[in-house]
Amino acid sequence: EQCIEDYFGIQIDRYARVNFYSFIDIVETVGGIDMEVSKAEAEGMKKPMAEQNKYLKNKKGTDYISDDIFAGKSDEDKVKLHLNGNQALAFARLRYVGNSDYERTERQRRVISEIITESKKLNLVQLDKLLNKVLPEINTDLTDGEIANLLLNAFDYMKYDIQQLRIPADGYFTNEVIYSMDVLNPDFAANSAFIQYIVYGSCKNIDEAIKQYQEENAYNYSYDTGYYGY
């Protein structure tokens, strides 16, 4: 948290953080989620699910997606499935299918979006039950009063649009190998600006933020590095 605040010039507050296995309970409490899953993803989910089953003391192979579902399909072909908590966690953790960590973070955003979608179907009593179930498993800086206010106004908040932002943004980082490790070296000045434009400013998406940043910093562009200066 402190590292992100220092490097990107933002204040992180009103956050909620859960661990792997609390995440399973959250998905189960909303009744599972619908997700488009490819044949390659279903196969790749088996490795993280094996780790989860061992931790949860489940029988080996529990919740594996049947190969029969994808009979005759290519690795890229997708099927809409209803995932339980164990399966949803494995799907969100999946890294070595597709474009590495980029697709993994995309899957994580898709899963979170679907959890929100399912939560919108709950009535006030069900939402209260959900909170009573998951709040003990969530680490947050929200006060009890703020949580109560969120619950009372939940139906209004659920009508809000959800904005997503991936950092570092395309074109504003370099791929490097440092100490034999693959790392992304971001243009911190640009990416900090993108976050601040969207969180605190008037930009609604990364494209608007990039355009605004380029307009404000055109005089300071380096053709040697491909970066806009500080």
Segments from the language model and where they lie:
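C-terminal solvent-exposed extensions
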Residues: 125-131, 137-230
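Second-shell loop/turn segments in exported
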Residues: 4-14, 77-78, 94-103, 116-121, ...
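Solvent-exposed, acidic/flexible segments
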Residues: 1, 16-20, 81-85, 101-109, ...
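Solvent-exposed, polar/charged alpha-helical surfaces in well-ordered, non-transmembrane soluble domains
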Residues: 2-6, 13, 21-28, 90, ...
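Structural recognition of the beta-strand scaffold that forms the well-ordered cores
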Residues: 14-17, 90-91, 163-166
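Flexible, polar/acidic helix-loop-strand segments at domain edges
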Residues: 25-126
